[in-house]
Amino acid sequence: MTKKFLSIVMAGFFSFTAIADEGMWLPQLLQAMNESDMQAHGLQLTAEDLYSVNNSSMKDAIVSLGGFCTAEMISSEGLMLTNHHCAFGSIQEHSSVSNDYLKDGFWAMSRDEELPNEGLTASFLVSIEDVTARVVAEINPDMTEQERRVKIREISKTIVDEATEGTHYNARVKSFFGGNDFYIMKYETFKDVRLVGAPPSSIGKFGGDTDNWMWPRHTGDFALYRIYCAPDGTPAEYSVENVAYQPKHHLPIQLNGVENGDYTMIFGFPGSTDRYLTSFGVQQALDITSPTTVDIRTEKLAIMKAGMDANKRTKIQYAAKYAQTSNYWKYFIGQSKGLKSMKVHDKKIAIEDDF
């Protein structure tokens, strides 16, 4: 999981044929770029149903959990669904040798039993605005890379301050497409997020590192939280006086399953992509970055495992750290294999030569 404040995107998988028509788009661009194609492939919603600044839309049910995961609102009473691996840190924080929720799972039988999680946030996207012209106007080709970065940070802070002045919102200017486009993302962030339930790790982490980053998966990778807010509906720190948040939109639960050819898509907060790396960047990843990362994490995992195997309390205390480390240890191993087998470096060179 990537610990960054994430940007919301939509990925579509149009599955009327065996070959998926795939892509990833910023939701505010759907109407101009993709709406008709998505509807032709079976989408029964409009772009306005998916993303609207002025009206309730699907974006209001999609949550950035802690800035490192995506979650979804599934009830009008603040209930939020996410992955077990996204809640793993919370589950660990509440576990002890005598009360091991990692091993046994946890289920709150009432609202009073739901567990608060200090520092965990749930952020809803309010709006996205293109600020490319304003940022680009402040930089020029004669700047060094360091000067460019400093100037972008300065103008981004000004844009954010102006956008959030007099509100309880927070915002961030993010770059896209290799630093060619800039958008400001405005969020409403809630700070009282309580753990409602999670299965035992034998279900939530079934398959462990062996199955991680693989397909198909057979893991019950889910957990439930509930968002709380002040009585007036605004974000508030944890308090017994807080009430369950009533989202502008929540996703209905469909129990009938899916059929072959159904339209499917993902709406959420991904991490980052290296898709626009040059051939030199790919070569660096293959020769230096990935193998070094794998080697360091291999040693780190071995050190942690030795201590965890020797003491149950230590095993619980380091469970989340170990999972986070092994997650991208496995990722970089697979990424290197994929880059080599797909001959990505050679393809990048061909693209650059053609350009």
Predicted regions span which residues?
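Terminal presequence/propeptide segments associated with secretion/organelle targeting
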Residues: 2, 9, 16-355
